[in-house]
């Protein structure tokens, strides 16, 4: 029975490996209580799922979509974009428009040397032998 059913299904699903995935997923759905679309006739769930695909009472595309959805661990939710926020540069330009241009202060060599003299020299640490 199953061999004939698989041969009937190849017309509906081109790839036999995809057919196995879809039929197995449908058989698991039937085991978990999903409604049958054909009579059982004392067949087991995998055979019933193949017969459903062969008789086109269930769409292979719908099965594929349900299979992908069941395997997803993360479902992406499209959230609306936040309202446009003004750029910092454009907001800052309006605030700084009245200010005069700020020039960096120049330090002479003598001022630099006087500043360095006031600093304490770094403490020497003894070298450790490994």
Swiss-Prot record:
Keyword NADP appears in the UniProt entry: no
The enzyme's E.C. designation: 2.7.7.6
Alphabetical UniProt keywords: DNA-directed RNA polymerase, Nucleotidyltransferase, Transcription, Transferase
Reactions it catalyzes: RNA(n) + a ribonucleoside 5'-triphosphate = RNA(n+1) + diphosphate
Recorded GO CC terms: DNA-directed RNA polymerase complex
Superkingdom of the source species: Bacteria
Gene Ontology MF, one: DNA binding
Record GO biological process: DNA-templated transcription
Entry annotated with the keyword Transcription: yes
Biased composition (Basic and acidic residues): 103-114
UniProt-listed Pfam families: RNA_pol_Rpb6
Disordered: annotated segments: 80-130
Oligomer status and interactors: The RNAP catalytic core consists of 2 alpha, 1 beta, 1 beta' and 1 omega subunit. When a sigma factor is associated with the core the holoenzyme is formed, which can initiate transcription.
Protein purpose: Promotes RNA polymerase assembly. Latches the N- and C-terminal regions of the beta' subunit thereby facilitating its interaction with the beta and alpha subunits.
Entry similarity comment: Belongs to the RNA polymerase subunit omega family.
Protein name (database record): DNA-directed RNA polymerase subunit omega
Provenance organism: Rhodopseudomonas palustris (strain BisB18)
Lineage, uppermost ranks: Bacteria, Pseudomonadati, Pseudomonadota, Alphaproteobacteria, Hyphomicrobiales
């Amino acid at each position: 029975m199953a061999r004939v059913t698989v041969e009937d299904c190849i017309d509906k699903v081109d790839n036999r490996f995809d057919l196995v995935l879809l039929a197995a997923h449908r058989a698991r759905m039937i085991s978990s209580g999903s409604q049958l679309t054909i009579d059982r006739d004392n067949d087991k769930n995998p055979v019933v799922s193949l017969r459903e695909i062969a008789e086109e009472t269930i769409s292979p595309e719908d099965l594929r979509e349900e299979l992908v959805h069941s395997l997803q661990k993360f479902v992406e939710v499209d959230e609306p974009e936040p309202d446009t926020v003004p750029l910092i540069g454009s907001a800052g330009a309006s605030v700084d428009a009245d200010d005069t241009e700020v020039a960096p202060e120049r330090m002479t060599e003598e001022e630099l040397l006087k500043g360095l003299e006031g600093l304490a020299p770094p403490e020497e640490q003894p070298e450790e032998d490994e």
